[in-house]
């Protein structure tokens, strides 16, 4: 018999152990030691009281649905930061039951919509979410680069700043070609501000480009250049500086909107490979 309950009283170490077990055969290799899991959850706005665990007769955690909650596109929203079931308990309806439990729970909290991302080739998961009423919002592409493959050619002086203030953000968002996904949003960056390095290029005292990288994981949540200054090497100069700021050997840019030809071409010219495609999906509650 499986019991469903929130995970607010479950140690993060136990959640991590089940997380690693559940994703051991995942389509994308997961490099997620405990510290990285904790940072990921902090960045995405994880709320244990809104997250569901599936427990067997021995009270062992065999599945989880970890939710974040924050305002998103003008609505109080929940975001699925990770859903998994260990191999020996799959195909028993546990994921569907966790979702139903979570949906009722977050509705009681006043949540208006449920947001998630799913790998497009994960057909069973895509089918499950569609059956639950989720609709596809956007197509995303993910990119990866071996740091050793990149040849630095900086043309512009790059500065590092300690944090991006609200007034600076108001200028930087003008450079965007698309709205960042949940995990790459301003709120997510601010939630884990000390885990990032921030690089900017200025011309005559005005910022014309910026980039942000996770010091440990090598994840770049945002990089953009003023449309009036593109094609001059500013983006490449920023990227070169970002690579110096991370311990990681693999650099990742996740959830690039498939419609953004400019961003995709920029990454491919830097030497990135496109390795995964995802759907951004949402459900109105």
Outline where the language-model segments fall.
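A short beta-loop-alpha structural element at the N-terminal edge
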Residues: 2-17, 154-172
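Active-site rim helix/loop that mediates acceptor-substrate recognition in acyltransferases
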Residues: 27-52, 56-57, 64-66, 174-198, ...
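Conserved GNAT acetyl-CoA-binding A-motif
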Residues: 77, 106-117, 246-258
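Conserved beta-strand-loop-alpha-helix junction that forms the acyl-donor binding cleft
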Residues: 86, 115-125, 144-147, 252-265
């Amino acid at each position: 018999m499986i019991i469903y309950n929130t995970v607010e009283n479950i140690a993060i170490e136990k959640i991590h152990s089940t997380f690693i077990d559940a994703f051991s055969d995942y389509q994308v290799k997961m490099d997620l030691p405990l510290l990285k899991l904790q940072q990921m959850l902090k960045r995405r706005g994880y709320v244990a009281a809104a997250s569901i665990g599936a427990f067997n007769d021995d009270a062992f955690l065999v599945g989880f649905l970890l939710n974040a909650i924050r305002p998103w596109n003008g609505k109080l929203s929940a975001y699925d930061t990770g859903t998994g079931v260990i191999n020996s308990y799959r195909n028993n309806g546990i994921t569907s039951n966790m979702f139903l439990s979570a949906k009722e729970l977050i509705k009681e909290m006043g949540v208006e919509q449920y947001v998630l991302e799913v790998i497009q080739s994960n057909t069973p998961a895509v089918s499950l979410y569609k059956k639950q009423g989720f609709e596809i919002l956007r197509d995303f592409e993910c990119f990866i680069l071996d740091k050793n493959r990149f040849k630095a050619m900086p043309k512009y002086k790059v500065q590092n700043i300690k944090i991006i203030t609200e007034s600076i953000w108001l200028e930087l968002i003008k450079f965007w070609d698309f709205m960042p996904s949940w995990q790459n949003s301003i709120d997510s960056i601010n939630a884990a501000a000390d885990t990032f390095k921030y690089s900017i290029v200025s011309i005559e005292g005005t910022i014309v480009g910026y980039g942000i990288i996770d010091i440990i994981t090598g994840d770049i949540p945002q990089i953009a250049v003023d449309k009036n200054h593109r094609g001059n090497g500013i983006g490449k100069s920023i990227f070169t500086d970002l690579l110096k700021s991370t311990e990681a050997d693999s650099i990742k840019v996740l959830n690039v909107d498939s419609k953004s030809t400019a961003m995709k071409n920029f990454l491919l010219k830097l030497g990135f490979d496109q390795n995964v495609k995802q759907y951004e999906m949402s459900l109105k509650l």
